[in-house]
Amino acid sequence: MESPAFFFTFFLWFLLLSVTGYSVYVSFGPPSKKLRDPFEEHED
């Protein structure tokens, strides 16, 4: 378990989970109030 491939795989999983968690936080958390909705801006 001391091979570089194990640590590289662990790093990639951590990076993937971090990016996914951050995108969910921005989409549905408190920062989502600042996001604009382009479909509501162009009501026809």
UniProtKB/Swiss-Prot annotation:
Instruction: Tell me, in a sentence or two, what this protein's role is.
Output: May play a role in photosystem I and II biogenesis.
GO terms in the biological process aspect are:
photosynthesis
Q: Per UniProt, what is the name of the gene that codes for the protein in this document?
A: psbN
Q: Which organism is it from?
A: Chlamydomonas reinhardtii (Chlamydomonas smithii)
Listed as disulfide-bonded, the cysteine pairs are: none
Task: Report the superkingdom from the record.
Answer: Eukaryota
The UniProt entry lists membrane topology as:
Single-pass membrane protein
Q: Can you name this protein?
A: Protein PsbN
- HAMAP family named in the record: PSII_PsbN
Database matches in PANTHER family = PROTEIN PSBN (PTHR35326:SF3)
Give GO cellular component annotations, separated by semicolons. Answer: chloroplast thylakoid membrane
Q: Where are the transmembrane segments?
A: 6-26
Give the UniProt subcellular location, in the record's own words: Plastid, Chloroplast thylakoid membrane
Family stated for the protein in its record: Belongs to the PsbN family.
Q: Which InterPro entries match?
A: PSII_PsbN
Q: Does the keyword Plastid apply?
A: yes
Keywords linked to the UniProt accession:
Chloroplast, Membrane, Plastid, Thylakoid, Transmembrane, Transmembrane helix
